[in-house]
């Protein structure tokens, strides 16, 4: 018990990075940018039918945080899962992969 170690300023950040869990990354198309600092992204998920084996396309719409309002409708974007930013926002815009024409 006499041996106590004090954490330096650099150690908590390193420990925090190890504690933080896996965060999902998704690609999708922006379908709405009418809100301030928020975009709606349609994400496609491909699943195999359990009985017949056919690959099905399932889409879901998620709200993502766009701090600088740079994404527009039709852009292909990369989003990452993040802490809850509002009642419905759990994703953050990482980068715009392809601008709409």
Swiss-Prot record:
GO biological process, one term: translation
GO MF term set: rRNA binding; structural constituent of ribosome
InterPro entries: NA-bd_OB-fold, Ribosomal_uS17, Ribosomal_uS17_bact/chlr, Ribosomal_uS17_CS
Source organism of this protein record: Leifsonia xyli subsp. xyli (strain CTCB07)
Assigned keywords, A-Z: Ribonucleoprotein, Ribosomal protein, RNA-binding, rRNA-binding
A Gene Ontology cellular-component term: cytosolic small ribosomal subunit
Keyword Cell cycle applies: no
Classification via NCBIfam families: PRK05610.1, uS17_bact
Pfam families attached to this UniProt entry: Ribosomal_S17
Function (record text): One of the primary rRNA binding proteins, it binds specifically to the 5'-end of 16S ribosomal RNA.
Alphabetized SUPFAM superfamilies for the sequence: Nucleic acid-binding proteins (SSF50249)
Subunit annotation: Part of the 30S ribosomal subunit.
UniProt record similarity statement: Belongs to the universal ribosomal protein uS17 family.
Descriptive protein name: Small ribosomal subunit protein uS17
